[in-house]
A protein has these predicted regions:
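N-terminal-proximal low-complexity accessory segments that begin disordered
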Residues: 4-74
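Long, well-structured alpha-helical subdomains associated
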Residues: 25, 54, 469-570
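Short alpha-helix carrying the canonical HExxH Zn2+-binding catalytic motif
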Residues: 423-436
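Contiguous, non-catalytic segments that form substrate-binding/exosite surfaces or channel walls
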Residues: 98, 104-416, 422
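Post-HEXXH active-site segment of zinc metalloproteases
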Residues: 441-462
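An active-site-proximal "capping" alpha-helix that borders the catalytic cofactor pocket
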Residues: 33, 247, 457-474
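Short, glycine/acidic-rich hinge or "gate" loops at secondary-structure transitions
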Residues: 248-254, 269, 447-450, 477-495, ...
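Extended, compositionally biased alpha-helical segments that mediate assembly or anchoring
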Residues: 552, 556-653
Length: 653
């Protein structure tokens, strides 16, 4: 699959552990101009150069462990068919996938399937030049450091801990803090905040906070600071990309991003974000930087990510119909008037084609993104929203006929409903969530955007999901030609509640709680509705199996309206106590018997609960004078080859 041909495209690839690897297709790439293709190529390089940053942010031992495992994988000349070696291979593939030794979704530390003895032996066999040894360090020193981290379940067991009532900083292994307590972190940033500032920077977004000689200091991520060697490579490729920018505004956005990478000044990030929102022309866009804060238990620190994209003009008509009516949706939402935006500004939405994934967007990626995250920028300048159409296409193609819905949907009528409308309403819910949900509502004057602390991410995701659920059933969508009829929404309601009440639990080990913000949000909504609207939705047993039964679809819309109004109030007022009660009551715990049943039913389907993507390999074709004549897309690279190549070509730290 070297060419851009779409015939016989293989969406599914290898499978290991709980992961299924997929491929995504760059539909329409061949229709772009050569200049646009080279622009994408350079931006893709900048996207891949940040890979080591993400590894290091997700745990301070991740890079040394990855490099050691890669050395064994490449140079081990013992029995490569042994159980130990095969287990090391799977472990390494999981480390590549998760950018570290923690599960990308549940955040728990991986348990190695190989023995400590085997690891000692394998490292001892390696040439010293192949191992990540510091100056003066021996193999024994390396083993003394890494063995407890890999094998001792008590040491750094969780990347992001959300357990109520404990020190979230001290009990999380992510590499954003060192030697400080949660209380010290919260006090440090509270002192920086000025309650009167209407345009506050995102304090803490771009630094590691640590204690040195008893004093708390911020280590800023910038060219001449922490991660400087990686950031210099990123800015170098951004400069190369700038020569091929489609217009002056794109070139200006790159200027501002490079300046931010050089200064590390958060006000430079705000200037870049505002310019990025306003940059609407042209086919190509990208995200590159320390953006989302889900990887920090306190929701302050940005994990590095990269995405290069180009517009899907045909599908974008759908999102533009939504964004052009943003004021109507805001005015008619069921939340109290004082929490609504009087004037919705600058909401733009596109369906895009991902061209390259990097950092925290790779291999597992979001399918919808709405940025920037700063509330005041969204209120004053608007936001950009994207739905990633070619990733959704890959998921849908891979899921077709896999037996999942047949097992968990209650009856043939419901199955037919989902098969008929599911893909359409799923895409629409993503559009509404990203484009309008995150962009809706407002904080009351003086409310700290971080007031909900560790519960902020879950409440924000619930708010956006509820906005989408409320409006996917609105006749306005039929009028806009977005849904075929007034029945279509039922497919989304059933799928959503089935997921929130039953099937998302397949991603959680027996005995564990729900940790991840998006999963917590779905559980919160589904469990709250089940309790408060039992006349509309129930869990019922049929032939010994539990199913979701919906008896009143219109009533569910009222349920989503009620909860949306309350969640928006919590966000607008910064009501931490109610946020805590809602999340802890509805979003954290699983019914052990029901969880066991769901896992057993899922096991029989022989499916992988998590999916991620292998990137296309972009290659340049030159003429005799050395000019680029074409950007070729190679869809045949194996997962293992790609990961080893990335470590080689994009190893910056």
């Amino acid at each position: 699959m070297m060419s851009n041909s779409n015939e016989h495209f293989q969406f599914t690839d290898e499978r290991f552990a709980d992961l299924q690897m997929l491929r995504y297709r760059l539909n329409g790439f061949e229709d772009l101009t050569l200049s646009q293709q080279i622009y994408i190529y350079c931006l893709a390089k900048a996207t891949l150069m940040g890979r080591d940053i993400t590894f290091d942010q997700q745990g301070k031992y991740n890079l040394r462990i990855r490099k050691t495992l890669e050395a064994i994988y490449k140079h081990y000349d013992g029995d490569r068919t042994s159980d130990d070696f095969k287990a090391l291979e799977v472990y390494l593939k999981r480390v590549w996938f998760s950018s570290g030794i923690y599960h990308h979704y549940g955040c728990e530390k991986f348990k190695p399937g190989f023995s400590e003895h085997f690891f000692y032996e394998a490292v001892s066999m390696m040439p010293e030049t192949e191992l990540p040894l510091k100056r003066g360090e021996t193999k024994e020193d390396l083993l003394d450091e890494l063995v407890p981290v890999i094998f001792d379940e008590e040491i750094l067991p969780k990347r992001v801990n959300q357990t109520d009532g404990v020190d979230l900083v001290a009990t999380s292994a992510c590499n954003f803090y060192e030697g400080v307590t949660q209380n010290e972190v919260e006090r440090f940033y509270a002192r920086l905040k000025d309650g009167e500032d209407l345009t506050p920077p995102s304090y803490g977004l771009k630094s590691k906070l640590m204690k040195r000689n008893g004093e708390i200091v911020e280590m800023t991520w910038k060219e001449e600071g922490m991660y400087g060697t990686a950031i210099k490579e990123i800015t170098s490729w951004l400069l190369k990309a700038q020569k091929y920018a489609e217009n002056e505004q794109q070139a200006h956005v790159i200027d501002l991003l490079i300046k931010y990478y050089r200064t590390g000044d958060l006000s430079d990030f705000d200037r870049y974000s505002i310019a990025w929102v306003k940059q609407q022309e042209g086919m190509v866009d990208f995200i590159n930087g320390f953006i989302e804060v889900y990887g920090d238990p306190l929701g302050l620190k940005g994990t590095w990510e990269g995405l290069v994209e180009f517009k899907d003009m045909k599908a974008t008509r759908r999102t533009q119909a939504i964004s052009q009516n943003a004021q109507w949706f805001e005015d008619h939402s069921p939340v109290a008037p004082q929490f609504k935006k009087a004037e919705v500004k600058g909401v733009t939405a596109h369906v895009i084609c991902a061209a390259m994934l990097g950092g925290d967007e790779y291999p597992a990626s979001a399918i919808g993104i709405n940025l920037p995250n700063a509330n005041w920028i969204r209120e004053t300048h608007g936001s950009k929203s994207v739905t990633i159409g070619n990733l959704t296409e890959a998921y849908n193609k891979a899921a077709h006929g896999n037996g999942f819905l047949d097992e968990f949907a209650i009856d043939q009528e419901t199955l037919d409903l989902i098969n008929r409308y599911g893909d359409v309403t799923d895409d629409l819910h993503t559009d509404l969530h990203e484009c309008l949900g995150h962009g809706s509502g407002q904080l009351l004057p003086g409310v700290d955007p971080d007031a909900l602390k560790a519960y902020g991410n879950t409440i924000e995701e619930a708010r956006a999901d509820l906005f989408g659920l409320y409006y996917v059933a609105d006749h306005k969508l039929v009028e806009l030609g977005l849904t075929p009829d007034d029945e279509a929404y039922k497919a989304q309601y059933y799928s959503y509640l089935m997921n929130g009440l039953l099937t998302q639990a397949i991603r959680i080990k027996e005995g564990d709680k729900i940790e991840e913000a998006h999963m917590r949000n779905r559980a919160l909504i589904a469990n709250w509705v089940l309790e408060h609207y039992s006349q509309a939705v129930q869990l019922v047993k049929k032939d010994g199996k539990t199913y979701v039964q919906i008896t009143d679809y219109p009533a569910l819309r009222h349920a989503f309206a009620d909860l949306l109004a309350e969640i928006q109030r919590i966000k607008s007022e910064g009501d931490f106590d109610t946020a805590r009660i809602l999340v802890e009551k509805y979003a954290v715990n699983l019914n052990p018997e029901l969880h066991h049943e769901i896992l057993e039913r899922y096991k029989k389907l022989n499916l992988a609960p998590y999916k991620g993507f292998i990137n296309p390999w972009m290659k340049l074709e030159f003429d005799e004078e050395g000019n680029v004549t074409k950007v070729l897309l190679d869809y045949t690279e194996s997962y293992e080859h790609q990961m080893l190549r990335y470590s080689d070509e994009y190893g910056t730290l």
